Structure formats: structure tokens, C-alpha cells
UniProtKB/Swiss-Prot annotation:
GO terms of molecular function: adenine deaminase activity
Similarity annotation: Belongs to the metallo-dependent hydrolases superfamily. Adenine deaminase family.
GO biological process: adenine catabolic process
Cofactor(s) essential for the protein: Mn(2+)
NCBIfam families: ade (TIGR01178)
EC code(s) of this entry: 3.5.4.2
Record keyword Nucleotidyltransferase present: no
Protein name: Adenine deaminase
SUPFAM superfamilies cross-referenced by the UniProt entry: Composite domain of metallo-dependent hydrolases, Metallo-dependent hydrolases
Amino acid sequence: MQIQGQIVDIENKRIYSGEITIQNGKIISIIEKNHEVKNYILPGFIDAHIHIESSMLVPSEFAKIAVLHGTVATISDPHEIANVLGKKGVYYMIENGKQVPLKFHFGAPSCVPATAFETAGAIIDSEEIKELMASPDIYYLSEMMNYPGVLFDDDEVLKKIAWAKHFNKPIDGHAPGLRGEPIKKYISAGITTDHECFTYSEAQEKLSLGMKVIIREGSAAKNFEALIDLLPANYENMMFCSDDKHPDDLILGHINLLCARAVAKGIDVFKILQVACVNPVHHYKMKVGLLKKNDAADFIVVEDLVNFKVNKTYINGELVAENGQSFVENINFETPNNFNITKKKISDFEIPSLAEKIRVIEALEGQLITNEIHHNSFIKNGKLVSDIENDILKMAVVNRYQNTTPAIAFIKNFGLKKGAIASSVAHDCHNIVVVGTSDEEICNAVNLIIKNTGGICAVNGTQNKSLALPVAGIMSDKDAWETGKLYQEIDAMAKDLGSTLKAPFMTLSFMALLVIPDLKLSDKGLFSGNTFSFVDLNVE
């Protein structure tokens, strides 16, 4: 097979008319040849850090959409499913991903559960990390979220890091806001990347210390604008990622969109493509071709180097997408789960008033971090309830692995004027998280999730919309387009109920993630990410 076009040689920073010859999935020659073909041929895009589960799609369904946007490979951390099903979940993702052409490169989840302050469905200890790291299907140790464990020399954390070093595999970081001496110690442990930088100066400091910074632009956390100006001077040590991407967003685009935005800022296209296509391959030793002789024939054909509209995507010489049509085949897959609770009562979500002021989680648009604010208690019949007028809404986290009392808190900036929204996609333990305007609506939303053994929903009286997620309670058994359509309908209903957030369900899913400050809620209670300890709802 031969393909002609304008060859984009990223390494040598040149573009020339050429012809590529492919045989048995490999490039056997690239020659300069004059022709009239104007399309550009370049290496495929790579998402350098993504939790496939956040798309609510199994890997084989994720692949169908990703290849349309020129994505040929991912660096994927399966810690979402691992928190539900343990290493069995990791192997599920690997085996499902092997059945399609897209090149998934999975890591061994380093923090399952993320902390000891929440209930997960499984534990992956250092012995299981050893087993996973020994596998040729595991390419790295996934993000080390337990940075206090690194800083204070936790024995189990250090053993996990040691096994990654033993097998000569890179270690991913997760250190939002970590600066000065703490970040120096964190890096000295052997941790090489961070995708959690949310300010220019933070990323600049980490780059200066030898860390590779991954610019993240997902459905909830959006750090592109804050960090992109670092790329021209640091392009050899940066990558792009989405981290968490909901299905409706994935349908619109992937890493290709970040390339287009970077070009629009006047950044050199070769530097952009080094970040988007090349750096992940070298850092993670990926089995992905870079448009060189004898490489795997992984490349894309785009209309131009401005908008990066993808005409064709090839993986191992196979045409997997063309002009908006995906050729990734349907795969039959199982739906393993871990959901063990019975329906809740309205009284389960009632809480007495004990103080004039309460701690409130302030959610922030486009960020995973939150603020802690204090607000006057809103009381009815001696009970703390949602203060709809001031947008201080009741929130709960319900343990889905065993019947326990829900943990209750209050949250600002969800904006609901009626009803409730709930999800069993709740990083990282994936218990049920819910925000609502009344205890009754909260209870109804939680019980709908329980009925579906996982999913997302919006409820308002007798009205409700839901998307069932029967694969570990976090992924759909439907295809990407149907899942995306249902998600859009529920997202629209959440906004009809008053939510002003751009992605209310994505933001909701991070309100139980304790490793990102300031204030979060686990199934065990209200938690300060700054002091790494539980705090009381009531302010004394």
C-alpha cells in the first residue's frame, strides 16, 4: 500500500511532498516525490494521561470515537475500575482494549484506594503492584496521588515505587499545588510527570526541577490556557492529556483540538506536534510509530496544520477511520460490577442543626480543587436543609459497597433550583454522590442509581432521566453515540433544574476526591485536603 501527501517530519522540522509505502503493518519506505496531493501526513495523536472509564465507555467503544479525531494511542490509568474491582478490573480493561486497533497503554494503579479515609471496592497493595508491573501489558506506575505518603516515607508507597524502578518503568505523578522542598522530595523519589498543575508558576517550577508537565484539558479540569505559554520554551518536556473526558465532549474532539488551539496562539507547529505526538512515545516507551522507516504504520492524514481536521487514521497500516466514519468493529463484552446496597429512606439524609455556621464546599468552574467557605446554617424543623436562594445545597456520599449511613455536607455553585442530580461515577472510590434541593429529591436520585446498579441521573418529582452504567457502575454497555446522546439529555436536564456549571456531572464526580484540596466529602465524612484529616460540618 502506498500513500502520498505532504509528509510532516517533526524530528527534522520540515514538510515535503512524499510517498509512504506500507507492508505488513510497517512503513518500509518514505521517499520524496512531487505530486499534487495537498493533505498532510503526520504521526497520530496521543493522550498522555486519561482514565478511559471517565468517558463512560469501555475501551473498545472509546476507540471508535477517538480514532475519528486522529488519536492512535493513549496512556491510560485504570484506577477507576480498580477501585471497584481491584486488579480484576485492570485486566478487564487490558483485554477489552486488545480487541481493537487503538493502542491502549495501561498503567498499574498506585493508589487503590486513593486514601484510607474512604471506602473502595478493592485494595491493590505492593504485592499486587509487583505482579502488575511484571506484566508486559503494564507500561508504568500510574499517578502517585498519595503525595503525603511519599513525603513522609510511607513504607507501602515506597515499595510500590521500588517495584516500578525494578521493572524499569516510569512513575506518574499527581501533586496539585506542591511547591518548594516538598516537590523536590516528591521528584527525588523517582516521580517523573505531573498533569495536575493549575498555575503557570507551579508548572514552571516543576519543569525547572526536571519534571515533565502534561497540559490537561478535560471535561472538568481545564488548564490549557494557564499553561500553554510554557510550551514554546519547554516543548521537549511537555505533553497533552484530557485526564477525564465525558462522552459528549469526546464526540466533539480530542487532542486534535488542543493542537488547533495552540496553533491559533501562534506557537510553532513542530513544537506543538512534538508535544502531541512524539514525547509520550519516548517517555513511556510506547509501541507506537512516529512516521519513520521500519516504524509501525501509525499515522493520520489531516486537511491542514491549522484546524487539524482528520481525514484518515491508520493504525498498524489499517485504515480505522475516514471522514467521520469509524471502522473499529463492535466487540461483545461482559459487565462485571460491585454494587451491594439496598434502597435508602428520606430520613437517612436528615441531619440536625448543631451550630449557627457550617463548612461549605465551594465548587469551582473548570477546576478539581475547591474552596472551604463558612455560611449560616439554613434550618427547618430543627434540621439542616438546602438553602436554595443562596445556592447552598445539601450533598451526600453513599457507600455503595455496604449498607452504612450516608455522609452529609453542603456545597455551593451547583445552582439547582429544584430536583437533584446523582452519580456513581465519583472519583476515586465510585460511591454514590448526590446534590439536591430537598431530602426527598436526594433520596429519589440515590435510589434510582441503586436500582440501575450504577449510573448518572437527574430527578425532579415524578420526572427523571438516567444513564445506566452496569460495567463496574462507571461504564455503559451501550455504544459511544447512544451513551453520548443519553448523557447529553441528562446534562441538559441538570441545567434545566438550574445548574450553571458547564459540566455538572463531571464536577460532581470530583467532589469526593480527597487527594485534591481544599474541602471534599467521602462516605466517611467531610475532609480537608490541606490538613489531610476529617473536619466537622459545624463551625464552632
